[in-house]
Amino acid sequence: MTQTVPQALQDFSLRYQQAWQDKHNELPRSEELADLVSPCVEEKRDGAVLWKAFPREEMADFTNVENAIELTLHEDIKLFFGSQYSADMDATWQGNELTLLQVWSDDDFTRLQENILGHLVTQRRLKLKPTVFIAATDAELDVISICNLTGNVILERLGSDKRDVLAETLTEFLSKLEAAV
């Protein structure tokens, strides 16, 4: 049976949590998110929060972004950002480091939507095919995105048409990610 995006994301989140626990003997920890409310927070300790990914009861709604840009987002984009709350998670893809971007809270989701809209407006202005970022890399202008037309996961150079396909599907990409803690 084919794995869904929410299942693949949950599986990676559990692999990340387990890798963190194996290394640090506690749930994943964040100092940066210590003062922000989230359903992910399990415990506050020493100026940090211990957290774990938390499934959303209802899928997040991207209608406002789609209406504003007059574009239907690829279903995998909506499933990726709309199925759980989590802190960002460090990972490697074929030995290359990245940070998988996630939604910490409803306030964070609002900011994400604004960033997605700004990204899509810029792409439209530059006459580029629409993509939505899902991970940051060490290279300032390189991001990992989902192509809105094909659903391919790509390495994209911001502001240019330079794109390399990393995986045919998001589930394939998530299943091959390795947690980096």
UniProtKB/Swiss-Prot annotation:
Gene3D superfamilies: Syd protein. The keyword Cell inner membrane applies. GO terms for cellular component: cytoplasmic side of plasma membrane. It comes from the Bacteria. It is a peripheral membrane protein. Keywords: Cell inner membrane, Cell membrane, Membrane. The keyword RNA-binding does not apply. It is found in: Cell inner membrane. Belongs to the Syd family. Interacts with the SecY protein in vivo. May bind preferentially to an uncomplexed state of SecY, thus functioning either as a chelating agent for excess SecY in the cell or as a regulatory factor that negatively controls the translocase function. This is Protein Syd.
